[in-house]
Amino acid sequence: MTTAKRPLALLILDGWGYRENTHNNAIFHANTPVLDRLNAQYPHSLISGSGLDVGLPDGQMGNSEVGHINLGSGRVVYQELTRISKAIADHEFEQNPALCDAVDSAIKAGGAVHIMGLLSAGGVHSHEEHIEAMCRMAVARGATKVYLHAFLDGRDTPPRSAKSSLSHFDDLFTTLGHGRIASIIGRYFAMDRDNRWDRVSQAYDLITQGKSKFQYDNAVTALEAAYERNENDEFVSSSAITDADGQVATLQDGDALIFMNFRADRARQITRSFINPDFDGFERAVVPKMHFVTLTEYAGDIKAPIAYPSENLVNTLGEVLQKQGRTQLRISETEKYAHVTFFFNGGKEEPFEGEDRILINSPKVATYDLQPEMSSAELTDKLVAAIESTKYDVIICNYPNGDMVGHTGNFDAAVKACEAVDACIGRVVDALAKVGGECIITADHGNAEQMTDETTGQAHTAHTSELVPFVFVGRNATIDEGGKLSDVAPTILTLIGEAIPAEMTGKPLIHIKE
């Protein structure tokens, strides 16, 4: 008979930061009696989830991928943004073998170099400085046909901020003497991660056939027309940009296609549509035979050259629990499932021995402000059942609402999202109390605590660099101040009586009073 476990649950409230300013702060204005009570009764502090503390550049806002890698690995992990920016500064980028091979193969075949990615200074999925470096490198190596397929942001940046980026790249190509922007489309279509293939197909058809809803002779003109249609950057319809002769640039046999996003989760679907022989997400009218390169590693099943392969993380929390014969559960909705599994495990797809996973489907709505509670009730039903089963030593759960609804910029919906999560936490804490379990409540980064950009007055749809909550609901304890996300895994190991491996550089934040 299996011994009953007293589970330790880590509840990650995605996009839930702490902000002193209460103006347009959805978390402050939400009615959250459960969290208010827990903060009053139990030890708590604030920890850092941004900038240098998570391996990002100083001042750079945190994000879900980075947050979960730090949470699960127990160390500050040098992030792809920093790593690639450093390679550019050190002039190593222009010698990268995978990128050089792609450019050279296209030149040799008389083809074009196509560069696609999120044209954004947001630094969450990509950075436009990296895209600029790629354009410069391609021309420097002798490419005369360089085409940029720009995915527009408006989510990790202000909703209407793409104009300066597009203007900059128009000027860049003029300076370089070669290349141009070939198409623009909102990330809503090109970077879907929830198997909404009808969206992805529009980006695929745009790049491979020039098939678009609109056609313009200039990218800025195309963007301004989208604004006239009331489309913010994220939702810009497929727009092909013609050259002086009225021609569109499409991906052909012998061309190279370089995907400049460094974050994996929203890069996987469109990548598979380009390279998987047995792809069945939608009907592909053409499948060009081209040289495809990914900037980083997107998934184990994606077989393409990688410019910057993942660094192997040893002795993450999941791996240590496996080695000690512990059981663990990972649970979230579709939107954050990859984060509590792949990213939390340091970029490993396969579950560890003793690791169960539960995926709850996120609601099929256009944007989550239409259903701010998302699937939190069903998620909590499954989580409570898992706690009551007493099967697990450690449970990792992510509630996506604060982030996913925060990204819509809809203040009232974000308030409702926070209230829904608070009610769920109450159920989880009650279930843990019945079985003698404990929980840590924290977040991966901020978002919902700032719903308006104080400078522009526009909706603030991006993450923030605010500190995030850290609450321990359990035994009588003290909590150290000044912690960061990488301290969470060592804290969990200490609470369950396991040794912290040398690879974990984080420090335990919770100290039980004997």
From Swiss-Prot:
Pathway: Carbohydrate degradation; glycolysis; pyruvate from D-glyceraldehyde 3-phosphate: step 3/5. One of its GO terms (molecular function) is manganese ion binding. Mn(2+) 1 binds at D403, H407, H463. It comes from the Bacteria. Substrate binds at H125, R155, D156, R187, R193, R263, A264, D265, R266, K336. The keyword Hydrolase does not apply. The active site is at S64 (phosphoserine intermediate). GO terms for biological process: glucose catabolic process; glycolytic process. Its cofactor is Mn(2+). Disulfide bonds: none annotated. One of its GO terms (cellular component) is cytosol. Keywords: Glycolysis, Isomerase, Manganese, Metal-binding. CDD domains: iPGM. Its EC number is 5.4.2.12. The keyword Metal-binding applies. It catalyses: (2R)-2-phosphoglycerate = (2R)-3-phosphoglycerate. Signal peptide: none annotated. Binds 2 manganese ions per subunit. Mn(2+) 2 binds at D14, S64, D444, H445. Pfam families: iPGM_N (PF06415), Metalloenzyme (PF01676). Monomer. Belongs to the BPG-independent phosphoglycerate mutase family. Catalyzes the interconversion of 2-phosphoglycerate and 3-phosphoglycerate. This is 2,3-bisphosphoglycerate-independent phosphoglycerate mutase.
